[in-house]
Amino acid sequence: MSEIVNCLIIGSGPAGFTAAIYAARANLSPVLYEGVLPGGQLTTTAEIENFPGYPDGVSGSDMMEDLRKQAARFGTDIRFGIVTEADLKGDLKRVVVDGEKEVLAKTVIIATGASARYLGLPDEAKYAGEGVSACATCDGFFYRKKTVAVVGGGDTACADALYLAGLCKKVYLVVRKPFLRASKIMQERTLNHENIEVLFEHEVVGLDGDNGVAGASLLIRRGQPDEAAGHIDIDGLFLAIGHQPNTKVFAGQVDLDAEGYIKTENGSPLTNLPGVFAAGDVADPVYRQAITAAASGCKAALEAERFLLTME
């Protein structure tokens, strides 16, 4: 016989654990499945200094462990497992964990996050948290007065380059195309900044360094009859080539936008399906901060509580 739970939370980042804290305190007896990366993306961040309550900063893994303990303290049933199937359209939502265990839920909070798109280099995993980052506002502070590179050509890449230019000695903006895709004003600010050097028609194809990133190998197309090799000395590499929301298992059920993010109603966690709520980066293509994810997790739990009251 399948297990039936009041509130099923899928994902264990700031959104998922905050939802769990609020749901547990409301006596909803939440069950949380941690997913592929327990603790979410923040576990790969060396230090967080912009989350309230940590005046001396905290490592991403330590902060997520604090949130996990707090959720467990109030009675959240935290389980390791990956949701591999989902049918969310009925009164009881059905999910399958790890391809075998079936769980039925009266409410579901989707907090599966969004994964940064990476370049696919063999060395990226090696340098994760040691010089490769997908969040300039999270990690840029640690590269003060150093040299870094940003990969990308859109608004996010330009914004990251401008942000880092205020901290770093030098910023390379590595762009595959011969032009920027960013808005005109962002292009102007980026191209005119004295600390930013834009490398058009360049592509990062390798990383090197014994203790963290020390350099990047480049493939150069600009001004070359054939592709040429190049190299830049850098202390960090920031990726700004987009994020991929982790919504594949929910496609065809919850409404998604063109990029795959879950559509919600007017800034709330409400989705198109009654009893199904979305929180954190999985529904946020704009801010993608730990504090905004936590706030949306709180809202999702409150909405789940209200929904369950209407079912009584």
Region annotations inferred by a language model:
Residues 4-6, 80, 144-146, 201, ...:
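Phosphate-coordination loops involved in phosphoryl transfer and adenosine-cofactor binding
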Residues 78-144:
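Glycine/small-residue-rich loop that forms an oxyanion/phosphate-binding "nest" at active or ligand-binding sites
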Residues 3-74, 147, 152, 158-184, ...:
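Beta1-alpha1 glycine-rich phosphate/pyrophosphate-binding loop at the start
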Residues 292-308:
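An active-site-proximal "capping" alpha-helix that borders the catalytic cofactor pocket
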Residues 120, 126-142, 241-287, 296, ...:
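FAD-site-proximal beta/loop scaffold in flavoenzymes
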Residues 20-21, 44, 120-123, 161-163, ...:
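Short amphipathic alpha-helical segments
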Residues 71-97, 102-105, 166-266, 306-312:
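A Rossmann-like FAD-binding core segment of flavoenzymes
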